[in-house]
Design a protein with these regions (language model features):
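Structured, contiguous alpha/beta core segments that scaffold functional sites
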Residues: 1-178
Length: 178
């Protein structure tokens, strides 16, 4: 089976449209927590964008890649200050040797932060959509679209080829009835 990456999938207008609509609809939903502090971070998770944009990014990545990540920046007392969205390419999860949980290696874009090794799972938001390995990682729904996208790609190539070989008349043919 051929792997479909998110960049390729988003060039397909149908996939782009459904991912955009679903992620926007999910981001419109209200996440509820019982503790006021937890509700505060859910309502305002990041310093770099509004809550809707943050959650739409998280849900879009979840729909495209099967999982999404955010780092939990905390104060000295362990209380969440804000969350930072992370691309999957910035995060590598590892199972602890005793199997009791996960740790993460995280590469931040900011040079002053740099890479962090062995980040405990309590410092990460890691949402997974289905799994084949007991919940360690998620499965991309795009893997199910591999054949369909290959067929569509070949159909598009055939159509473009046929159009390129079609006869282009340089003028207009006039017929006089007589």
């Amino acid at each position: 089976t051929h792997y479909v990456d998110a960049r390729t999938a988003l060039k397909n207008s149908d996939i782009y449209s459904i991912v955009y609509q679903l992620s926007a609809d999910l981001a419109d939903g209200k996440l509820k927590a019982t503790a006021p502090r937890a509700q505060g971070i859910l309502n305002n998770p990041t310093k770099t964008s509004n809550a809707h944009a943050f959650w739409q990014s998280m849900y879009a990545q979840l729909l495209l890649g099967g999982e999404c990540f955010a780092y939990r920046w905390r104060n000295d007392n362990g209380l969440d200050l804000y969350w930072e969205y992370l691309r999957p390419s910035q995060v590598q999860p590892f199972l602890l040797e005793d199997g009791s949980g996960l740790i993460y290696n995280v590469d931040f874009d900011e040079p002053e932060i740099g890479p962090m090794q062995a980040v405990p799972q309590g410092n990460m938001i890691h949402i997974r959509l289905m799994s084949r390995n007991g919940g360690k990682t998620g499965i991309s729904p795009l893997s199910a679209l591999s054949d369909e996208l290959q067929i569509k790609d070949q159909s598009n190539k055939l159509t473009l080829s046929a159009l390129a070989r079609s006869i282009m008349a340089p003028g207009v043919l006039k017929i006089q009835h007589g």
